[in-house]
């Protein structure tokens, strides 16, 4: 019976230790990153406040619509590796809808953001402008007042 209790205790200890290691692996380190800026594709514009963009320079994953709600195109430019696109505005495009719609599109300066603490769906670049990583953390939801 004593052997059974020892095995149970060792198994329990291994499980608890494993949980601590797993939780610790999910945590981000506290040191600051050396990132230059971040780009987070966001929904922009509206039928009454149009944006100046074209399909080539629009972000992949974002859809672009006319003032009447007609789908125009999906963006073609990858923030990690932007295309060389003309600078003209497509006057048919009024607004975009992107998977992430809250917060800033351009994060500069990045402060103490690291790849671990950066938001999923945001792309982070070094001070030399080269792509470093995509963020790994879930973006907090904006606080909604119930009053």
From Swiss-Prot:
Positions annotated as Sequence repeat: 25-81, 82-141
InterPro entries: Prot_inh_I20 (IPR003465), Protease_inhibitor_I20 (IPR051391)
Signal peptide residue numbers: 1-25
GO molecular function: serine-type endopeptidase inhibitor activity
Highest taxon listed in the record's lineage: Eukaryota
Keywords, alphabetical: Disulfide bond, Protease inhibitor, Repeat, Serine protease inhibitor, Signal
UniProt entry tagged with the keyword Disulfide bond: yes
Family annotation (Pfam families): Prot_inhib_II (PF02428)
Coiled coil regions in record: none
Record site: Reactive bond for trypsin: 30-31
Cystine bridges: 28-116, 32-112, 40-122, 52-89, 55-73, 56-85, 62-98, 115-133
Annotated site residue numbers, Reactive bond for chymotrypsin: 87-88
Family indicated by similarity: Belongs to the protease inhibitor I20 (potato type II proteinase inhibitor) family.
Name the UniProt record assigns to this protein: Proteinase inhibitor type-2
Organism from which the protein derives: Solanum tuberosum (Potato)
